Amino acid sequence: TPLVFGAHPYGVPASGLGDAAVVEGLSPAELDAAHQRWIRPDNAQVFVVGDTTLAETVSLLEASFGDWKAPATPMPTKTYDVDVPAPEARIVLLNRPNSPQSVILGARVLDTRGTDDNTVLLAANEVLGGSFLSRINMNLRETKGWSYGSRSGVTYNRDRLVYAVQAEVQADRTGDSIVELEKEITGFVGDNGVTAAELERTINGNVRELPGQFETSNSVLGGMVNIVKYDRPDDYYETIADKYRSLTADELAETARENFIYGDIVYVVVGDAEVVEPQLERTGLPYTVQQLDQ
């Protein structure tokens, strides 16, 4: 994450564990101050799904949290107004001796944000690498047989999104796999756009899976949270099917050209450097080699 986000808040690993030196230096007073600053009733929203009523729910909440008062200090806000590093195509190889497989993860930060309407973006990715029948998986798994599975996806945040491609491949085909990934992306944003069959499969798949996404209370809750988290209209899930049905191949191709840009993806490879490093020259990308503990 720091490789693509730099000093941006999203550059902190998603695990939330932070930096060991910083954690070791924290005091109980600092933790309490952070809790008081952020965990407060005027900065909270409650979502409830179940066999209940608003009156019953409010009564229970008042009983449990009625005495919880907001502090006098202003409610804090998060800022994402931090530039990310300019995209720079390269490979970072992390040496893991004797690994029979290599794990490849390539990523770039997109200009689009989670609060944008990304229906077309997600549909375009589904064709490229977001489903089992995607081009990336069909190439590396079904045609080449170098991987049990390869995929691409858009990592969702409120602010800047990340496009990522991932594959676990046999060690002696690491370099070739990166070449094929680049080839698929290049073709997708070039002359090898979305076919009629791919468009139909993507539309039908997304529309037909909608009912199954709300079979449980937890699924309904997740939909409610997403609407609020990403500033979506209340009727988002009622209108999304029509958005899928109106998709065109030209829309998907244009969105792909705007987002899946060839030539500026950072690849991180975990594998046996003795086997993998000699293969990286054929990718045409600059690379560095590091030990896992660096």
Predicted segment positions?
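Extended amphipathic alpha-helical segments enriched in small hydrophobics
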Residues: 167-195
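Helix N-cap motif at beta-to-alpha junctions
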Residues: 50-55, 170-174, 272-274
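Small-residue-rich helix-loop
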Residues: 200-207, 211
